[in-house]
Design a protein with these regions (language model features):
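Active-site-proximal beta-alpha core segment in soluble small-molecule metabolic enzymes
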Residues: 2-174, 183, 244, 256
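C-terminal active-site-proximal or functional interface alpha/beta core segments in diverse enzymes
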Residues: 143-264
Length: 264
């Protein structure tokens, strides 16, 4: 999601990175760039049946499911293909990432994941479907998170969830911790009238984010996957956009540009 540049993807694949995809198109790019299928996860709330089939045919590591209906579809596709689908369930921990509300994904009001209070029931349901192999738990609480505390809270939540699931007889051995690690953007071009971003200090280094979450996660003995995404490529380029219009709606002034949230 953070980078679709095939030249950069090839370098990341050669360096041993994995890939998190949210569409068949992204999965195609990842495979074309040389990512090993056993290092690819498929996330997203709206996976089509044909996309699920494409993922299963390529034997990727895990499909991260987000609802009971999706579990049914994955199971039916796997049955049709004569396969057993490896899945993780994304759980919504209701944790405030303390980032921009448009890119917060771990609160109850967000569409992502299954509610924490329903997790055990849905994990048991997934385990009852003969063509699913439940291997892990997944969470992702937001993007551009600049504080360590939400990650510490998320790690404690996931470790507790794994413990509860194991006590219920579910052999969970994998945690996908998600990402959202904030980055300090570097302003390559200064513009009069716009504030210059400080050179450092506002965002902790990536190491501190990981160190905050790692101790409690390691105690589970699970394989651990992180999604550093934006933090890898954020300062590898600049976004050049043009002001199209300015407008006022009541007390607010808006500047309309030819770029969107997806470009950020």
């Amino acid at each position: 999601k953070a980078n679709a540049n095939t030249a950069l993807l090839k370098i990341l694949a050669q360096e041993g990175a994995g890939a998190d995809v949210v569409s068949a198109g992204e999965l195609y790019l990842a495979l074309k760039a040389g990512f090993s299928p056993d290092r690819i996860t498929f996330a997203g709330v709206g996976k089509r049946e044909d996309e699920i089939e494409y993922a299963l045919k390529n034997d990727i590591f895990s499909i991260n499911a987000e609802s009971s209906q999706e579990l049914q579809v994955i199971s039916l596709v796997a049955l049709r293909l004569g396969k057993k689908a490896r899945i993780s369930l994304r759980v919504n921990p209701d944790i405030d990432a303390q980032s921009h509300p448009y890119i917060t994904t771990g609160l109850k009001q967000n569409k992502f994941g299954i509610p924490a209070e329903e997790a055990l029931k849905l994990f048991q349901y997934a385990g009852s479907l003969s063509h699913l192999e439940v291997i892990g738990v997944h969470a992702h609480i937001g993007s551009q998170i600049t504080k360590v505390e939400p990650f510490v809270e998320a790690a404690a939540f996931l470790a507790g969830l794994v413990k509860s699931l194991r006590e219920a007889g579910l052999p969970i051995n994998h945690i996908d911790f998600g990402g959202g690690f904030g980055v300090q953007y570097i302003n390559a071009l200064a513009c009069e009238g716009l504030p210059k971003e400080p050179e450092g200090g506002a965002v902790p280094p990536l190491q501190l984010f990981v160190e905050g979450a790692l101790p409690v996660l390691k105690e589970t003995g699970c394989s651990l996957w992180f999604e550093p995404g934006r933090s890898i490529v954020a300062n590898a380029g600049i976004l050049l956009t043009r002001v199209l219009y300015t407008k006022e709606n009541g007390a607010k002034k808006f500047v309309v540009v030819d770029a969107g949230m997806n470009d950020l």
